[in-house]
């Protein structure tokens, strides 16, 4: 039998009851998945259960049943989305069917997915990235004496573009059940520096933060009319004058955190086309950095991406991007 070493200096701690251990573990498991992800996974499970009921199949996720589900769903939605559905199904059914992940990786299921991608696959339609000309168009549309909400809108737009931020990191979701105050940036975390001219604030949590440590967002002044530094300072002055005691960094004229609908509705006034949306901020900033010759590893770090998937945000054909960087076509030799 193993015993605690006599040299050990373990602090004295009160023992927990079994009920408390179970309760605390349940709470920890609840925090393991974000609310928005839980909603998506539950939706995927509901689709699977509906499929099983419709076809009188057992719920047991065998390779046969999963492959049938893939074929059926791929004829109704984009096959690329089916993989996400399978991930959600595995996450929700694993406590009841421990072998579900192994079945998901089986040759039958993986080949069925590959076949559906080839049979039903369609080109991916991505939102257009913002350019500096687009940003200038937004600023030109603002009145000479902008309101607080005008200042907020421009500050969010320019900050999101230059810091490669997701719109969801700057505003609240439209659904109240998905809103989490632990994810929003607070006013007291803001630091403004004159030398060098830049501002920063703390982002408590984001999609790529696997350790839940948060990140400090830093945005520097640039010599362009679309400089984010001056716009942020103008917004901050207005915000502090109206709501000096409110803790949230981003606040509308009503004293509430802006929602996605609040931002998109203002964006639609300037860009009626649905080619532009929240992703246009992040993809526009990433494309701008790539055009400036910034190393891809640095772009990944600035955007806080946890994998190489960030490359899809650089919305520029590699041939065109190379020509822009070196000033000549890719196959043209130097004279």
Where are the language model's segments positioned?
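Extended, non-catalytic subsegments within catalytic or DNA/protein-binding/adaptor domains
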Residues: 1-335
């Amino acid at each position: 039998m193993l015993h605690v070493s006599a040299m050990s200096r373990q602090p004295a701690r009160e023992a927990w009851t079994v009920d408390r251990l179970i309760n605390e573990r349940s709470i920890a498991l609840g925090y393991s998945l974000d609310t928005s992800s839980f909603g998506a996974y539950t939706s995927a499970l509901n689709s699977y259960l509906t499929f099983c009921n419709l076809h009188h199949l057992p719920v047991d996720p065998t390779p046969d049943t999963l492959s049938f589900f893939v074929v059926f769903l791929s004829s109704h939605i984009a096959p690329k989305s089916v993989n996400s559905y399978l991930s959600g199904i595995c996450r929700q059914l694993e406590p009841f069917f421990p072998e579900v992940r192994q079945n998901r990786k089986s040759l039958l299921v993986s080949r069925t997915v590959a076949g559906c991608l080839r049979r039903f696959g369609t080109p991916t339609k991505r939102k257009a990235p913002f350019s500096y000309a687009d940003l200038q168009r937004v600023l030109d549309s603002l009145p000479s004496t902008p309101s607080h909400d005008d200042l907020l809108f421009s500050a969010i737009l320019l900050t999101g573009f230059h810091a490669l931020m997701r719109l969801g990191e700057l505003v609240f979701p439209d659904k109240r059940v998905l809103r989490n105050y632990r994810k929003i940036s607070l006013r007291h975390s803001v630091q403004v520096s004159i030398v060098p001219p830049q501002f920063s604030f703390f982002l408590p949590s984001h999609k790529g933060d696997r350790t839940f440590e948060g990140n400090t967002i830093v945005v520097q002044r640039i010599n362009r009319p679309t400089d984010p530094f001056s716009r942020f300072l103008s917004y901050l002055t207005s915000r502090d004058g109206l709501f000096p005691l409110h803790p949230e960094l981003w606040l509308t004229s009503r004293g509430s955190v802006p929602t996605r609908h609040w931002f998109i509705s203002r964006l639609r006034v300037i860009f009626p086309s649905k080619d532009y949306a929240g992703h246009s901020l992040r993809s526009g900033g990433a494309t701008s950095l790539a055009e400036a010759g910034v190393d891809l590893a640095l772009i990944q770090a600035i955007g806080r991406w946890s994998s190489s998937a960030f490359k899809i945000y650089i919305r520029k054909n590699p041939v065109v991007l190379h020509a822009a960087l070196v000033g000549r076509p890719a196959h043209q030799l130097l004279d």
